[in-house]
Amino acid sequence: MPDTVNYTLTIEKPFTHYCEVEILLKDITQDHIIFSMPVWTPGSYLIREFAKNVEDVKAENSEGKALNFEKINKNSWKVDTKNEKSVKIKYKAYCNELTVRTSLINTEHAFINSSGTFMYVKGFEKKKCILAINCPAGWNKISTGLEKGSVNIYSAENYDVFIDSPVEIGNQNVLEFDIKGIKHSICMAGKGNYKDETIINDFKKIAEEEIKLFGGEIPYKHYTYIIHLVEKGGGGLEHLNSFVAQASRWIFNDDALYKKFLGLVSHEFFHLWNVKRIRPAALGPFDYETENYTKSLWVAEGWTSFYDDVILRRCDILNNKEYLEFLNVNVNDIMRFKGRFSQSLAESSFDTWIKFYRKDENYSNSQVSYYTKGALVTLLLNIEIIKSTEASASLDDALRMLYEDHKKDQSKGYSEERMKEVCEIVCGKKLDWFWEKYVYGVEELPVKDYLNDCGVLLTDENETSSGILDVEIKNDNGKLIITKVIAGGTAYESGLNANDELIALDGTRVDPVLAGALLKNYKEGDEIKVLINREGFIKELSIIFLKPLPKYKIIESENKTETQQKFFNKWING
């Protein structure tokens, strides 16, 4: 039985977008060995069929003699190893999609999403993995969370850790800072208008604040940030001691966009604890062959989405006004749409494999995001704990308790029952009613009441507005194309559809500038004719303006009571 699984990654012609992978096993005794490519990547809950990028599979023994093998399903190859002492499988992988969950190789650099590149060996998943990297001449830097050995040699204690460690190869700008003697490396891949010192200072502030929240202990030997600076893009993906994120390369001089990016940094770094260590039982050890279902993604992502902006406030990257403006976006993303009455948080978590990554124009009318609604419910839960304990405790304490659970037994995650129990212990009372209404149920969230408990006001900016269709529209070369029709609004009830082109309102030709001005002439109860282009046919519809759907605004009260101020301080400061 081999002690290690040895991988070699070779990038010979980066302009082809291919890499070559070899997997070597020595001292084998099995009559056959199965090699499989994962079908999904942890943290991104969609079957992605990474085996589609695999080509030219070969198998041989230690002398280079070809071994018989067959493909036994969509992502697995079975090699005949009877009477053989070693086996090597070789294949090419096509890498030409730069996202946080896929791989790219080009003449500038390579980003390797390990779960979509490296097969695992059935029965050998717990063995140490060693990776040798052969990169093109002139590429001098490798950034990864893997443990570094000799030149271009890296290792992981098992396959789970191995593929939870993406790899960036090229000549990226690497910035560094230390916290308590632990090195943090920031890989900035691509051109951008950032300043090294600003990036280092802000990333360090965020890391220190989150480490403090969890008691000051650092759960890793080193940490790697991989930031891809792109023309257009965004998003991030957490890993065990690293994360990868995308940012538009020219955002760094725009204060609002830069702070939004720092929210992403805060989010992905927070996952170090919430999901990578404090995790639902279904999320590790992983089954890479199929969906891994859980009803607790609203905790894994929703709690993290609540804290990502709170952390920015705690380390003074945001002030109170800016923080509440960020929160306001989440409130409107949920409270304006009927999807909050159609799908519970538990259902949203469970169905992520078939819904969340396959959004259509009706998504907001029929579903909720376990990120966004999860963050709102987390806010309410936090305030419930604060109120019930007279601000002597908060959700921070529940997180720390769950983290202590993890440290006692790192082999398994929490059950839904244990997670709720911890919240009840911290809150000092049963919370079955809260879960039934807001996690497993679809009752209206009492956001206004909970915010008011903390001296924060929620108002409706559309209360006195008029002439609102309640649609989302894009300007397509001067054409006004409806992209989303909000259920319950004027357009929805009048029969307008997504993909309709607005041509005229009440006999007047509209354009992107004129449309808004014309709509202001109409009030609730007015009826007008709307001319549209629907799939190449011109149609005229009658619409009656309804009361506009709410558009919320959150502001901090200037006249908080002593109790409201105490609760607000606990929410913001922990």
Regions found by a protein language model. Name each.
Residues 1-40:
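Early extracytoplasmic/domain-onset interaction patches
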Residues 5-7, 19-23, 87-89, 129-131, ...:
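Hydrophobic residues positioned within well-ordered beta-strands of beta-sheet architectures
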Residues 47-56, 60-220, 232-233:
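Non-catalytic architectural context of zinc metalloproteases
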Residues 125, 193-205, 255-256, 260, ...:
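Soluble non-cytosolic domains of exported or imported proteins
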Residues 141-143, 218-221, 281-282, 313-325, ...:
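Acidic/polar loop patches that form or flank catalytic/metal-binding clefts of enzymes
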Residues 175-297, 303, 307:
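Juxtacatalytic substrate-recognition/specificity segment
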Residues 243-252, 277-278, 289-340, 531, ...:
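Post-HExxH zinc-binding segment in Zn-dependent metallohydrolases
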Residues 308, 318-574:
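C-terminal recognition in membrane/secretory proteostasis and scaffolding
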